[in-house]
UniProtKB/Swiss-Prot annotation:
Subcellular location(s) of the protein: Cytoplasm
InterPro entries: Daa-tRNA_deacyls_DTD, DTD-like_sf
Gene Ontology biological process terms, A to Z: D-amino acid catabolic process
Residues annotated as transmembrane: none
Motif window: Gly-cisPro motif, important for rejection of L-amino acids: 137-138
Protein name: D-aminoacyl-tRNA deacylase
EC number: 3.1.1.96
Recorded catalytic activity of this chain's protein: glycyl-tRNA(Ala) + H2O = tRNA(Ala) + glycine + H(+); a D-aminoacyl-tRNA + H2O = a tRNA + a D-alpha-amino acid + H(+)
Keyword tRNA-binding: yes
Amino acid sequence: MRAVVQRVISSKVEVDGKVIGSIGKGLNVLLGISKEDTEEDIKYLKEKIINLRIFEDENEKLNKSLLDIGGDIIIVSQFTLYGDCRKGRRPSFIEALGGEEAYILYNKFIESIKKEVNNVATGEFGADMKVYIENDGPVTILLDSKKTF
């Protein structure tokens, strides 16, 4: 399971011109799910994301987590995080989990976050979305539950 985690001032997702999810200060998470992912990957990534110390304290040091600041989180599915561009010029998405199986893991991830964070918004799985991200910093972290980077 992979995530692009961005510290944001605000973020929102639109589908067909309608806002379906929005947050204030917190994290925008683009989430990719692979064929190898299990509930252990959900647990690992959830703990890592909500406890990442990427918010500034009173001394402007990155010492506070999403939980520490009581921030919001928006989670957007993005299978393209498993795009393999090593051969040719068109990405291969063969490692990405698709369909119903990915949808189930995506929802389990969201539910695990909701147990820890008060304001959780999401995109729409499988939809063509417009994602608006007002970065703060910018601070962007790449995470992989298999620890490949």
